[in-house]
Amino acid sequence: MKVISLKKDSFNKGGAVITLLPEDKEDLFTVYQIVDKDDELIFKKKFTSKLDEAGKKKSTDLVKLKIKVISEDFDMKDEYLKYKGVTVTDESGASNVDIPVGKYLSFTLDYVYPFTIIKQNFNKFMQKLLNEACNIEYKSDTAAVVLQEGIAHVCLVTSSSTILKQKIEYSMPKKKRTTDVLKFDEKTEKFYKAIYSAMKKDLNFDKLKTIILCSPGFYAKILMDKIFQYAEEEHNKKILDNKGMFFIAHCSTGYLQGINEVLKNPLYASKLQDTKYSKEIMVMDEFLLHLNKDDDKAWYGEKEVVKAAEYGAISYLLLTDKVLHSDNIAQREEYLKLMDSVESNGGKALVLSTLHSLGEELDQLTGIACILKYPLPDLDEDDGEE
């Protein structure tokens, strides 16, 4: 992400004017978390106009527009973020020239033209999101291939989601006769070669630190041997010079949940300790463990968590990005104060993306939860109850 300028709004306390140029899908997700309904956007859009009555001659102009946001449409996998809004008055006179106020327009973000966000409410969480988006070390540095016989999934693991880049599926023949064995071996070779080709196409080996190959049985080990074999045959230096980034892990399935199994497995913690998402999985796993044990060290729900924070008892505060993107600005500010309170008492605050299975799970538990430093029973009872 390129932050071209960020100015606090002198007329609107708590507001800001930010000019950005997103560079990848992670940046789109950052913008999605920052822009709220009723914020204003200034952007450039191409308009095609007819010059004659026959409509044969046309001109395409790049027009500067300003809209107030009504709604958004976001798809992480397809790198798609679109805002719908209505044109508003631009006091500077630079935008909406020859475009009437009140006209409904849409704006799809791209990686070519910078755009400006005029926010009514810009808080420290949004500032943190921008800082992280500009930090290349914080970007996705982990890929994973999870497989079993005849099926494989090539994925990127980011702080905001597990992105399926390509699914490879082959129908494997049954080995009843000698000819079937030969067919099986041929199909197996094609299967592994297809995975290798998908990895070359969809993964940027220059930016990755870790590539997880995981499977039940020995499929992951065979895949790694095949990857290095094919790389030797092609003299693929990007792979041959980075053999150390590959590691093999065991999981129970060749589907996406197999990646989650690996990320939360303590056996692989040392190899994954530098990845942000691995930390989130381990904390969420600990929360669910305490919840299942019913040992009064894990609570969810706003009332219970706020009460635990008042005691200074929170070790980890867990929030979804959805609650921090709430239309209720006052409630959003209360959650930010809660994060400050927890951190000032030595705890840590984690924000989980609802595009990940972790965030989805927390969202089903009210979107706010905590792990305590010590057990606190009866947090769910009213203060006046005996």
Swiss-Prot record:
Per its UniProt record, what Pfam families does this chain match? eRF1_1 (PF03463), eRF1_2 (PF03464), eRF1_3 (PF03465)
According to its UniProt entry, this protein's organism is Saccharomyces cerevisiae (strain ATCC 204508 / S288c) (Baker's yeast)
Q: What else is known?
A: Present with 1720 molecules/cell in log phase SD medium.
Alphabetical GO CC annotations of the entry are:
cytoplasm; Dom34-Hbs1 complex
Organismal lineage:
Eukaryota, Fungi, Dikarya, Ascomycota, Saccharomycotina
Q: Name one GO biological process term.
A: RNA surveillance
Q: Which domain of life is it from?
A: Eukaryota
Cofactor section? a divalent metal cation
Name of the protein described by the UniProt record: Protein DOM34
Q: How does it assemble?
A: Monomer. Component of the Dom34-Hbs1 complex, also named Pelota-HBS1L complex, composed of DOM34 and HBS1.
Outcome following mutation: E361A: Reduced ability to trigger the No-Go Decay (NGD) pathway, reduced ability to promote degradation of non-functional rRNAs
What results from changing E26A? Does not affect the No-Go Decay (NGD) pathway
Describe the task this protein carries out.
Component of the Dom34-Hbs1 complex, a complex that recognizes stalled ribosomes and triggers the No-Go Decay (NGD) pathway. In the Dom34-Hbs1 complex, DOM34 recognizes ribosomes stalled at the 3' end of an mRNA and engages stalled ribosomes by destabilizing mRNA in the mRNA channel. Following ribosome-binding, the Dom34-Hbs1 complex promotes the disassembly of stalled ribosomes, followed by degradation of damaged mRNAs as part of the NGD pathway. The Dom34-Hbs1 complex is also involved in non-functional rRNA decay.
- Name the major location: cytoplasm
